[in-house]
Amino acid sequence: MRLYPAFFKAAFSWMDPELAHTLGFAGIKLAHRTGLGRVLSRVTAPDEGAEVNVMGLTFPSPFGLAAGFDKGATGTHALTQLGFGHVEIGTVTGQAQPGNPRPRLFRLVRDRAVINRMGFNNDGAEAVAPRVAAALQTLAQESIRTGRRRPVVGVNIGKTKAVGLEDAAADYVRSTRVLAPYADYLVVNVSSPNTPGLRQLQELDALRPLLLAVRAEADRVTGRRVPLLVKIAPDLADEDVTAVADLALELGLDGIVATNTTIAREGLGLRTNHDDVAACGAGGLSGAPLRRRSLEVLRLLKEHAGEQLVLVSVGGVTTARDVMERLDAGASLVQGYTAFLYEGPFWAGRINRGLRRAAREGR
């Protein structure tokens, strides 16, 4: 019997979503500090047979937590104890910023979705970098102690709101300079709808010099090749999706994260009352309604790029079956986030058990 849905309804459904997130994350970190997280990890951890080798990295499993949950690397170790094979930190910007005014996070409970216009609220790259370094050190020590594979830690970087588009590349380079030395991989986020003008950076004339600058800086400051990916929006036309894929291939990027949240409200099959959705205002919608388009983009990218790009699929992932569907469609890695808010702290563990059953049954 699953108790979390009833607990969510009683404890969180009446609460401001952002406050609920803060309290829930605090609970996860408390479990870690008290040693409960270590106990939980014995039942949530993926099987050793679930390991995947991607971008020169070994992931304990193909399923991880998307950017947006742990924006400042304040609970990375705690999150890995819940069973995620990787955690993507961020989005982190070159400068600290408070994000957009509240309220800025809204639930569509009937659709198991959320609308957010957070606006990259974060502490800035210079504050986050030492936390990432500390998390990696702790995870490495735990890996030695337990003999289990260390979860992978990626970092997602975005543009500071106060920085103009003409200076965007320099802002991304600033983040790269301090974060790349500690990131297992880097994701360039040019697809959030909540920073004015950001999605214009998906246009090839703007994206090419930005990615070249980030690649060069990552190589310069690390002395190693840090895997580099770009995260795209589901709202791109198909021809623009393939154009970004061609650019990624041209520049030697490692992969594409597909997709971010959508600004669409029509054509998603929403069950929430139209007026209630409209009352939420602007922002990116994530969760179950994004599943179809996210899968479409994944299949399009796989058909276009074949094995030449690593594809990380995110958007509408809730169950182990969803994860397997994305892997079968060509994803190397799969991420989730919104379902975590509805499914609770044992969500990744349930997905790992589902993947384990599927492997035993030869699926």
Swiss-Prot record:
GO terms for biological process: 'de novo' pyrimidine nucleobase biosynthetic process; 'de novo' UMP biosynthetic process. Its main location: membrane. Disulfide bonds: none annotated. It is a peripheral membrane protein. It comes from the Bacteria. It is found in: Cell membrane. Gene3D superfamilies: Aldolase class I. SUPFAM superfamilies: FMN-linked oxidoreductases. Pathway: Pyrimidine metabolism; UMP biosynthesis via de novo pathway; orotate from (S)-dihydroorotate (quinone route): step 1/1. FMN binds at A67, G68, F69, D70, K71, T91, N156, N189, K231, T259, G287, G316, Y337, T338. Its cofactor is FMN. NCBIfam families: PRK05286.2-1, PRK05286.2-5, pyrD_sub2. This is Dihydroorotate dehydrogenase (quinone). The lineage of its organism: Bacteria, Bacillati, Actinomycetota, Actinomycetes, Micrococcales.
